[in-house]
């Protein structure tokens, strides 16, 4: 008897249940699938995921506030990624897609109830969360609408900028996405949450940097804009306003002092070198945009050479 066909049908039924916000029904169907084919890896993986979420749903009753319930789903989505890393099984995209729809649909329902209050329609955090939810359910046009509203209040926020960049990339607005990602990783690289990113533009860059540098966590985030420049991802640049240029130079001065004074084994010390290099790159890009004296460009390049000769050779 060929068990592949019925199990495939059961998997699809389980995923449809998840997308319809019925995780309990999905569990029942997946258990049936495993009875039909005990060795089916996708069914086993999917059941682990569904059970993980059903366990988390028990705690939802602890929250009386609608907004807190929506926030709980988003926080658990990030914890779910940690669970996936720990499980270490092969990931099955149809399952992860269904789980994503389940999570963000549920969160969106709670946030929409809160958004109905006119006073909340200008709350930048709520607008960001609604945008994230629409992205999670695959409605990129509405995600763009809310994220563009959120960015009006959070122009220098790495998380909001990166979410807006990600949605633009998913909508094939490549040039806008490149500019926004570059901005996000300059303004606040530690604010970018790679677990919520979906576009191949940023996921591909993440994978390349992880493979080449063997990095993760905060250090990975600091190196990504540098390799974004090397790999030709962050290629859309802009001229800085005078006040921005002044702030950039002040930040460079502070970072140079941090790099010189902090022992390499001190906590967070590894973050300062790549952050300083990225600031140098922004200064060089500005000089090139305004056709500044080539001597100033070369002077800044030599500063990069002093702190990281390998990066210097790759960008020179």
Residue ranges and their predicted role:
Residues 6-32, 76-103, 126-134:
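Alpha-helical segment of the N-proximal tetratricopeptide repeat
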Residues 8-9, 42, 125, 132, ...:
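Start-of-helix register in tetratricopeptide repeats
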Residues 23-59, 152-160, 307-314:
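Short, charge-rich amphipathic alpha-helical segments embedded
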Residues 83, 87, 91-119, 123, ...:
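Eukaryotic alpha-helical solenoid repeat scaffolds
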């Amino acid at each position: 008897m060929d068990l592949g066909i019925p199990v495939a049908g059961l998997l699809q039924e389980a995923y449809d249940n998840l997308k319809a916000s019925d995780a309990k029904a999905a569990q029942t169907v997946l258990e049936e699938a495993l009875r039909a084919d005990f060795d089916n890896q996708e069914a086993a993986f999917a059941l682990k995921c569904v059970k993980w979420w059903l366990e988390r749903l028990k705690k939802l009753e602890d929250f009386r506030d609608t907004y807190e319930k929506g926030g709980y789903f988003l926080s658990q989505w990030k914890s779910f990624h940690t669970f996936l890393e720990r499980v270490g099984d092969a990931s099955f995209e149809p399952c992860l897609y269904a789980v994503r729809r389940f999570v963000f649909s549920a969160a969106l329902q709670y946030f929409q109830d809160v958004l109905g209050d006119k006073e909340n329609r200008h709350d930048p955090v709520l607008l960001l969360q609604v945008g994230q939810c629409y992205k999670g359910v695959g409605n990129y046009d509405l995600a763009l609408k809310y994220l563009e509203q959120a960015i009006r209040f959070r122009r220098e926020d790495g998380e909001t900028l990166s979410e807006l960049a990600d949605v633009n990339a998913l909508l094939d607005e490549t040039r806008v996405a490149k500019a926004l990602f570059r901005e996000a990783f300059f303004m606040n690289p530690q604010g970018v949450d790679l677990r919520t990113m979906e576009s191949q533009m940023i996921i591909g860059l993440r994978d390349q940097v992880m493979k080449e540098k063997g990095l993760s966590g905060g250090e990975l985030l600091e190196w990504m804009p540098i390799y974004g420049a090397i790999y030709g991802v962050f290629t859309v640049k802009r001229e800085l306003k005078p006040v921005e240029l002044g702030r950039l130079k002040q930040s460079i001065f502070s970072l140079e002092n941090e790099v010189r004074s902090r022992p390499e084994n001190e906590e967070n010390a590894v973050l300062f070198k790549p952050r300083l290099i990225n600031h140098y790159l922004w200064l060089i890009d500005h000089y090139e945009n305004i056709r500044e004296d080539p001597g100033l460009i070369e002077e800044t390049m030599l500063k990069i050479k002093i702190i990281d000769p390998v990066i210097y050779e790759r960008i020179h």
